[in-house]
């Protein structure tokens, strides 16, 4: 089970709280595909980091199990190590055979000889391909996605999408995005993050309408003065 129970997360911006979540709740069951729409810069990455256990909430409970993995997550990759060394470390981290996992990642990423070079020599697109190869090679119970489900050129993106679709036949997805089209195609449950609250919607169309009307023109709006008292600004 994944999600949030009365979770609050904020950070200070120019002395005022920039709210990501404020007493927000959401429960996601096994194998569910949930899309949450949120404007750019309003906390997509923070929400994913909280679900992944990388960043704690200021208050409340984060629900998570041990079988989740952030899609395209590059935080575990070290720039001084080669692509091969990096994915072997990831394999050991999640309990997979390093040799088999490295072979899979080398084939999927299509990096050629660069696979055996240090990551600091990679371009952004090369790092993205390696990160997605590593993510899709892990048989996660739930994938956590921050605004994208694929990387690279059109052919490689299609390859990512096909492989992810295969994985999602027996796995869940929590997809936090700013593009309603992406969540429509990938998710079955839909919601919107509004002023720190997670609002569940009955359909993608309802979520898109709420997102478009209430957020695209009001991204970055500060919370009401009466709510400031609930945050410790010391």
Description of each model-found segment:
Residues 1-33:
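A short, flexible loop at the N-terminus of ABC-type nucleotide-binding domains that lies
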Residues 10, 69-162:
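ABC-family P-loop ATPase nucleotide-binding domains
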Residues 30-92:
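ABC ATPase nucleotide-binding domain signature region
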Residues 55, 190-191:
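Conserved catalytic/dimer-interface elements of ABC ATPase nucleotide-binding domains
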Residues 163-178:
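Conserved catalytic loops of ABC-family nucleotide-binding domains
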Residues 179-186:
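Conserved H-loop
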Residues 194:
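A cytosolic small-molecule/anion-sensing beta-strand core signal
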Residues 197-224:
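Conserved beta-strand-loop-alpha-helix hinge in the C-terminal portion
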